C-alpha cells in the first residue's frame, strides 16, 4: 500500500511538471505573427461558454484546467476563473501578450513569443515583454 501511494505521488509530480512551460534559448530573430512550441499538447479540449469566453477542460477529469497549457503547438494561459486570457497579462511578476483575435499563425488567446505585438512591443522567446 505504501509503495502504491509513493508511485501515485511520483506520477502526479511528473504530470504536473510536464504541464509547466519550458522554453528554448532565446535567439535574436524578431518577427511579427505566430509563435509555436514543440512542447506536448495538454490532454484536454476547448469549450466555448455562452458569454463568449473559452475554457480548457481536462479529458481525464472533466474539470477546467488552470495555468499554462499547450494546444496545437501554442501556449495559452487559463486564469483561476477557468477562462482563457487575452491581451496583456501580468503572470508571476512577468508581463505577457496573448492574441486578442485570430491572425495568421496566431490563434485567439495564444502567447506571442519572440515577436512584436500588434501594439509594437517586443516580447522575448519566453513571451515576456522585453521593453
What is each PLM-predicted segment?
Residues 4-131:
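Extracellular adhesion/carbohydrate-binding repeat motifs centered on closely spaced tryptophans
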